[in-house]
Amino acid sequence: MISADEEYTAKKNRKKQKRVILQMAILVVIATVFYLALFTVGKYKPYEPTAINMAQDKGFIALSYFGVDRVGQQPLISEDRLAEHLAALRKQGYVTITQKDIKDFYEAGKPLPARALFLMFEDGRRDTAIFSTSQIEKYNYKATMATYPENFAKRDTKFLKPRELKSLVDTSFWELGTNGYRLSFINVFDRYNNYLGELTPLEYAMISPYLGRRYNHYLMDYIRDEHGVPKESYEMMKARLDYDYQKLSDDYREGIGSVPQLYVLM
């Protein structure tokens, strides 16, 4: 005879098993959609040397998007609007350049195409890769996907994982960059000048309608109190920053085998 406790435990275990199976099924669907979205039939072709006109070399423009989804919920851009942007750029004769092109331009004076475009997407979102790759391939553009390696270990399907980032690079239409190890805000005040201190990205997003412009990226300043007085010494700040840069390097090397050459703070 089964006791009430045993029956309850068995019922609870069955529910847990169903939940695990459902979660695994969702992950499989997400992975399938992602890899189908990355299916490309061509390879990126660098711009032709004839695109370079020494007399018209005026550097390049950099265009960065926070992210892309199907409908364009703020702060993301929609798939259709991105298609309009890229089509307009292509019509005006813009060709994309790579991170190496930029480095050679500044360090060796290598000329760039008359209409050179550096294209980047921030935050390392999975939906960005899904909804933008086909458009990038369509116009033979090359883009950089910037990520936060702190997200590699999180069980959050919103962000790209190392294996997926490698798949992006394999398409030849993507390069990798970084926005830093993580995103965090310090010395935050709301628009009424109330001191809030330090905020995570989630906390920041939840109260963003009530925030002004008084805040700092956590790598850009001392952590300060409401009077602007540092709450840490120079040595403490340096140790905090050193730890962050070391974690960035370690996680990228472990996840994708190397550290991206492009670093952009949001």
Segments predicted by a language model, with ranges:
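N-terminal Lys/Arg-rich, disordered targeting/topogenic segments
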Residues: 1-19
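Hydrophobic membrane-insertion alpha-helices, especially the h-region
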Residues: 21-42
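Alpha-helical scaffolding within the catalytic cores
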Residues: 46-51, 103-104, 128-132, 156-169, ...
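Metal-dependent polysaccharide deacetylase catalytic core of the NodB/CE4 family, i.e.
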Residues: 66-69, 115-117, 137-266
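C-terminal domain-boundary segment and adjacent tail
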Residues: 2-3, 79-111, 240, 250-260
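Membrane-embedded segments
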Residues: 105, 114, 120, 124-134
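Short, solvent-exposed loop/turn elements at domain surfaces
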Residues: 69-75, 129
